[in-house]
Amino acid sequence: MKTLYSLRRFYPVETLFNGTLALAGRDQETTGFAWWAGNARLINLSGKLLGAHVAHAGLIVFWAGAMNLFEVAHFVPEKPMYEQGLILLPHLATLGWGVGPGGEVIDTFPYFVSGVLHLISSAVLGFGGIYHALLGPETLEESFPFFGYVWKDRNKMTTILGIHLILLGIGAFLLVLKALYFGGVYDTWAPGGGDVRKITNLTLSPSVIFGYLLKSPFGGEGWIVSVDDLEDIIGGHVWLGSICILGGIWHILTKPFAWARRAFVWSGEAYLSYSLGALSVFGFIACCFVWFNNTAYPSEFYGPTGPEASQAQAFTFLVRDQRLGANVGSAQGPTGLGKYLMRSPTGEVIFGGETMRFWDLRAPWLEPLRGPNGLDLGRLKKDIQPWQERRSAEYMTHAPLGSLNSVGGVATEINAVNYVSPRSWLATSHFVLGFFLFVGHLWHAGRARAAAAGFEKGIDRDLEPVLSMTPLS
């Protein structure tokens, strides 16, 4: 029987289903990995691994461009974005492209340009990926030492980390530049129902920016997800970009301290596990952000948040019944609590009924009706504007609660339409991806630590049924 375990330390071998199969001259015997182990076959071939990563980037960018153009081709300007199953155009609209007052799409050409640019970029990346995978040098260390590396070289690894941090910092500053100088971004809090505007008064106070990190994640606190001010968001990106760039320079110029050399496992699989763990955290945070935050993810494009749709329902019926003569300030519901208005645990005037659980919602269509002690009865009686009524009625029937069969809306709302909110899709997908990335982090971290301890041998397959089966080909 062929050797099941590679003699190379740290590289457990998986069993081939067909021992005669060899791909591009790199079979199980020479690489220590079966064909289906993917890029693990290239773990010591920096040139080929570069090709795999560049080609992967090309696939990602190709999807972005193709899906972008698909959404542009299907876009109907008469309907809100969130009713059309769009997941990319809302991001472009949030950046201020092609939209005007109230989030109305006035020009789809910027979306078309975005799609085409991504397709062109994907072609360049695809060519580069194919070149490095098939034609370029197998290893970069000899020809291009700057781009070469050895996984155990701690100094080189932190240099690569530093380069990545600088690139992330530049990305953060691109958003800052867009918001400050290149047309601005969409602000759902702009007077009259939202508009595109340039950010002119950045929040750079560290007590404000880092105060979000110190907030409780519960109740009316909401940690960083509670941000409801574009000045804070863009100012936060200034801080984040600066920290990433300075941290990148630090990691390029310095070598790991002794405690870091001892604390971390320094191998390719360990770096993979660290990356998966970081991406998992990003996914969970993004899930919470898109589900609860209607400033970074404006409801005009992504649909209302769950609390927002619930409060909109209460507001819509308050408006209706008030027009029919109800005294919304004193009417009682079946429990004896206020039918339309009641008090929160902190004494604020809030909407009554089931939506009381969402009393800490903040939304641009509702905030003008608040006073120093919560909802202001005088404003509710005299200052409600038509745009607030229209928006709340729309949000009431478009709660982000759709199921797989596309039956959407609040269970108590008979006028809900059949649709699935992109807010639901984005929150759910990021949670699921974050979870599986976390599982991947645990898996690869365990393997990396075992290998570093010297007892990683792979899975014992001496009695595996497939070994006694006839090869497929």
Curated annotation (Swiss-Prot):
GO BP, sorted A to Z: photosynthetic electron transport in photosystem II
Residue positions assigned to the propeptide: 1-14
> Main localization of the protein?
plastid
Positions with a binding annotation for [CaMn4O5] cluster = E367
* Modified-residue entries (Phosphothreonine), positions: T15
Sites bearing N-acetylthreonine, chain numbering: T15
List UniProt keywords, sorted A-Z. Answer: Acetylation, Chlorophyll, Chloroplast, Chromophore, Manganese, Membrane, Metal-binding, Phosphoprotein, Photosynthesis, Photosystem II, Plastid, Thylakoid, Transmembrane, Transmembrane helix
Q: How is the cofactor bound?
A: Binds multiple chlorophylls and provides some of the ligands for the Ca-4Mn-5O cluster of the oxygen-evolving complex. It may also provide a ligand for a Cl- that is required for oxygen evolution. PSII binds additional chlorophylls, carotenoids and specific lipids.
Cellular-component GO terms for this entry: chloroplast thylakoid membrane; photosystem II
TM spans (from-to): 69-93, 134-155, 178-200, 255-275, 291-312, 447-471
Sorted alphabetically, which InterPro entries does this protein's record hold?
Answer: PS_antenna-like (IPR000932), PS_II_antenna-like_sf (IPR036001), PSII_PsbC (IPR005869), PSII_PsbC_sf (IPR044900)
| Entry GO MF terms | chlorophyll binding; electron transporter, transferring electrons within the cyclic electron transport pathway of photosynthesis activity; metal ion binding
Which SUPFAM superfamilies is this protein grouped with? Photosystem II antenna protein-like (SSF161077)
How would you describe this protein's topology in the membrane? Multi-pass membrane protein
Its localization reads: Plastid, Chloroplast thylakoid membrane
Give the UniProt family note.
Belongs to the PsbB/PsbC family. PsbC subfamily.
Q: Quaternary state and partners of this protein?
A: PSII is composed of 1 copy each of membrane proteins PsbA, PsbB, PsbC, PsbD, PsbE, PsbF, PsbH, PsbI, PsbJ, PsbK, PsbL, PsbM, PsbT, PsbX, PsbY, PsbZ, Psb30/Ycf12, at least 3 peripheral proteins of the oxygen-evolving complex and a large number of cofactors. It forms dimeric complexes.
NCBIfam families membership: psbC (TIGR01153)
Q: What does this protein do?
A: One of the components of the core complex of photosystem II (PSII). It binds chlorophyll and helps catalyze the primary light-induced photochemical processes of PSII. PSII is a light-driven water:plastoquinone oxidoreductase, using light energy to abstract electrons from H(2)O, generating O(2) and a proton gradient subsequently used for ATP formation.
Protein's UniProt name: Photosystem II CP43 reaction center protein
* Source organism of the structure: Dioscorea elephantipes (Elephant's foot yam)
